[in-house]
A protein has these predicted regions:
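N-terminal Rossmann-like FAD-binding beta1-loop-alpha1 element of flavoenzymes
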Residues: 67-93, 206-215
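Conserved hydrophobic helix-helix packing surfaces used for dimerization/oligomerization
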Residues: 69-71, 92, 198, 222, ...
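Rossmann-like dinucleotide-binding cores of NAD(P)H-dependent redox enzymes
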Residues: 91-129, 133, 211-258
Length: 336
């Protein structure tokens, strides 16, 4: 238990972290020069599971501060912030637009990677600590909610959950889905009808998750289409390896040019990398047959709830500009 208490000083969800993190620290661990890297990934998972099993609670000597903080979004950032704020004695309320807490941990990471009972246990610990979580509450105006609720500060952490679009002809065909909605539908029980042949466009971890989930739904063919090669894909290599082991086919150096109106025939163009590693068209085309197409091209941020906050500046990618303490240009409004 003492080891778990040490981990909890910085990492409030070790049972989740011990499953979802790809542990990049282990390959560069300086312990390698002695015998081998510390298996911190496995340690976190073991201690986190043990804590959930035995009902351990983190220690805190903080007295009530009299400060009240609103957190907008119950994803990993919001839940982590709530934990640390409670450890300082602040009163904390999380307001979440969805029906359950977890954010992309629940709606973006498939259950085979992160069992929901593990996620639920970590959330329940926060509630036992005194964090209030209000679900099905979409905040439209952060400043107004701050004023009406009498909060001393607001932390906005809604995440990037709006799928990016693309200009592929027939993009809005009924058989074309975005990966976030697809994975969210799996979690909410509204499983989409995808057919036996499924194409996934993108090369990130979300694309791998969508392809592996499609296989679990019974797809005989799950085909990833990605414009670069394996070396340049944004997904972690082990994700691609596990996907291929489960029967997912990855079409490297390929991009979608068009599809028919029923999204059953997809025309792809073969690409090649130039001297700078950028994909260039070759003029060589091929076709794939698919019953549905899942787009996994990244996500954008919905920052509309900050439109009424004077002084808040947005970056070109839609994220919010903050100082070293994560405060925006509006006093008392933080973002991360």
């Amino acid at each position: 238990e003492e080891a778990w208490q040490v981990i909890m000083r910085d990492n409030p969800m070790p049972a989740i972290h011990g499953r979802a993190c790809y542990h990049p620290c282990e390959p560069v661990c300086n312990r390698q020069s002695v015998d081998g890297a510390v298996s911190i990934h496995a340690v976190e998972r073991f201690l986190g599971d043990r804590a959930n099993e035995l009902g351990w609670m983190p220690k805190s000597d903080a007295l009530p501060s009299g400060r009240k903080v609103l957190i907008i979004g119950a994803g990993p950032a919001g839940l982590s912030a709530a934990y640390h704020l409670r450890q300082f004695g602040h009163e904390v309320e999380i307001r979440e637009a969805g029906a359950e807490a977890g954010g992309m941990m629940r709606y973006g990471i498939p259950a085979y990677r992160l069992p929901r009972n593990i996620l639920d246990a970590e959330v329940q610990r926060l509630e036992k600590m005194g964090v209030k979580i209000t679900l099905n509450h979409k905040v439209e105006d952060a400043v107004k909610e701050k004023q009406q609720g009498g909060f001393d500060a607001v932390f906005v952490c809604v995440g990037a959950h709006i799928s990016k679009r693309t200009d592929i002809p027939a993009r809005d065909a009924s058989k074309v889905l975005d990966a976030v909605s697809f994975l969210r539908g799996m979690e909410s029980g509204e499983q989409p009808v995808i057919g036996r042949r499924v194409a996934i466009y993108g090369g990130g971890n979300t694309a791998m998750d969508a392809a592996r989930t499609a296989k679990r739904l019974g797809a005989t063919d799950a085909m990833i289409i990605y414009r670069r090669d394996r070396e340049h894909m944004p997904a972690h290599d082990f994700e691609a390896v596990e996907a291929e082991e489960e029967g997912v086919k990855i079409n490297w150096l390929s991009t979608i040019k068009e599809m028919d109106t029923d999204a059953t025939t997809i025309t792809i163009e073969r690409m090649e990398l130039d001297e700078n590693g950028r994909p260039q068209p070759t003029g060589v085309f091929d076709t794939l047959q698919a019953d549905s197409l899942i787009l996994a091209l990244g996500q954008d941020i919905d920052s509309n709830l900050l439109q009424g906050a004077s002084g808040v500046e947005l970056k070109p990618d839609g994220s919010v500009s903050v100082d070293a303490g994560f405060m925006t240009g509006h006093e008392g409004i933080f973002a991360g």
